[in-house]
Amino acid sequence: MSPEGEESHAEDNLYFHNTQMQSIHEETLAEESHAQSIQRSISRLSSFKHEDTDSESPIPVQKVIRHIKKTNTNTNTTKTKKRKLKVSKPRKNMSSSESVRQMYGSRKNGEQQGSIDGFLMSRFGDVDGCNESDRSSKLISQGEWESLSKFHEESNEKDKLLRKKIQRYYSEPQEELGEGCGMLSQASADPETKMTKEELESLYDLDSSTVFNQTTISAIGDMSEPTQVSEPCVVILSQTKVQSEASTQEDGADASVQEIKSSVPTQELFSTPEFVPAPLEQPVNKEVCSDQSIVVLEENVQSTQADDSDIVELISDSDPEPEEVSTKVQVLRSIYDSSGPVNDKQPSVASETVESDSTPIVSPVKTPQGTRMHVVQVASSNPSSPIKIVEENTEQQEEVFTDVESIYSTARTSFGTPKHTSPVILLESSDTDCDDNDNDVEPLSSMPMVKTVPKKRMRTTVLQVSAALKVQNYTDEKNNIKLRKIGDDIPVEVPTKDVEYEEIPDSQESVGGEGDNSVSIIEITREVHNNDYTGDESTDLFQVGLNKQDTCEDTSSPVVQIGGVENDILDSSLIEPVPEPESVPVPEEVQEQPQPTAIDKHTATQLREKFQLWGLKPVRGKEKMVEILQGISNFILPEHELLAVADKQELQSCIFMKLDAVIREGRAMYDRILSFEPIRIEELQMMLQSQDYYLELDVLRLYCDSSGITTTNA
């Protein structure tokens, strides 16, 4: 080969080697970066590793030393510091091929991969080498899974067999016991089987030594001392009864063995008054009862507190004096507590009677004595009528009822028309009669007993009619109503008192002359029931008016008609016209009293229930409730349909439909509502009153809210 050919061949080889070295160097850099990323991930996962120092040795971790260069911050210093220069070894120039050879020959990456494989093998085991003989692997093989599942099924079957054996043991009757078991165990095994007479006799013939030899008695304090029997042991044998018979016995009667001390001290729990129990007859062949007794004081204390009355009373009696009550003989009953069944027979009163040594008890309740005057204020508004209300002196009148019937209940009224006060009702009460049956047995109590008497609330009304009437005395015992005429046909003078009274003006019928003395005074007494009387309304006066009657030929003789009450107490048979010597001028036209409507016939309690049913605002007084319902009835015609309304929604729908039609007739108010102008509810009420429609403000407010009408209070 020529020298030129050799040179060209050498150049080609050099180029080839250079490119080969460059590629190897690039691959080495890539492997090194990959190894560094793996090392970083391993260092992060090492914090979650559970190290076991006993079984495994820690994996060595290469330490990386970083040299931190310190910069001199104090540049502006007066003194210059000498720097210690570190002598560094001169670096040896190394070619790229040699550096590649060193990196490739050290095989650092291979060592790191081997350490990682060793860690994984130690933790999770070798999957390929897993077999039944090598149990070092933590992976469970298929055979192990199958054995575990079979063991679970077998254990369930064993549990089922065990349960069946237990149930069969308790359900099936036990076989006869063999030798070595006594009759007590046989009796407890089958309690329903009764023992024979010979077996019972053999049990009772047992010696006490046999009983004590079979039992072990030891002292609690010292277990090393020999057993000693200080007290005799009494054993009571009882045959267990059937469930139906055993259920009738008490809880303490089913004990088969009881240990009873020979002497039990008697403890008296009730020390005052002194009491010595009488000896009781001990039953023969019964369970021994203990002598411990409890003394119980029997007292039937009767409450003497009076019932709360519906009427507020202002009692003007003097302070009651303390009243001494005589002591009575108190009976003490002894109840003996025993573990056995309690004897139903109680000791007689005669055998155990003691006298109480306690001091007399002063009762805070004063027994009613004499006459007490109770003043009750009743609010009423009396309209102008031809009847004068005359105040009558109650001392000159006779009793309406007897003392027994009128205790705390008889009412007398004397009506007047004071200027700033309401009419006054005087309630009179008297002492109760003594009970004639003194020999009757009274309940044992140290408190005074007050005999309860049913209360009656009576109302007496005095009417003065400016006409001559012939009234027959009338008494209705069933309804407790009494009517009579007082005095002659002359006016009764009103007694002068310190209080100024305002006289009720007379009507047109009484205008006949100042010297006309043709008047009639009628007194009506009736019973007021609780449902007819409330504190919010006045039931003092009847609705009295003058009407013409077709049966009377003489129109100058008026007839009194009383209405507005369920039981009419006057009719045409009781009141007859009386001819007068002189004619009384009567006006041509007489205003007639309106007949009572269906709403007026209802009581205040019934109307209050209607208000609550319809959701109306509750008001005080029957007259106010009737007035509100009459205003609502104008929107619901006829009136009987108002009382037939079932609920609140039906009533509101009927009122609101008629109210819409009434408002649309008045164009002024209707235009304001259409323009969303705020209106006052009082203005709407005044507009309706101008058209003879009367509704309360709460009903109008509900109408505005349901219809979306804007309202204001300004």
Swiss-Prot record:
| UniProt-recorded Gene Ontology molecular function terms | 5'-flap endonuclease activity
**What keyword terms does UniProt attach to this protein?**
DNA damage, DNA recombination, DNA repair, Nucleus, Phosphoprotein
List compositional bias (Basic residues) regions by residue number: 79-92
* Predominant cellular place of this UniProt entry's protein: nucleus
Query: Where located?
Result: Nucleus
> Where is this chain compositionally biased, Basic and acidic residues type?
1-14, 24-34
Q: Which Pfam families does its entry note? A: Slx4
Q: Which GO CC terms are listed, alphabetically?
A: Slx1-Slx4 complex
Q: Does the keyword DNA damage apply?
A: yes
Residue ranges for the region (Disordered) are 1-116, 337-369
InterPro entries reported for this sequence: Slx4_ascomycetes (IPR027784), Structure-sp_endonuc_su_Slx4 (IPR018574)
Oligomeric state and interaction partners are given as:
Forms a heterodimer with SLX1.
What does the UniProt function comment say about this protein? Regulatory subunit of the SLX1-SLX4 structure-specific endonuclease that resolves DNA secondary structures generated during DNA repair and recombination. Has endonuclease activity towards branched DNA substrates, introducing single-strand cuts in duplex DNA close to junctions with ss-DNA.
Name under which the protein is recorded: Structure-specific endonuclease subunit SLX4 1
**Which organism is the protein's source?**
Candida tropicalis (strain ATCC MYA-3404 / T1)
The encoding gene is: SLX4-1
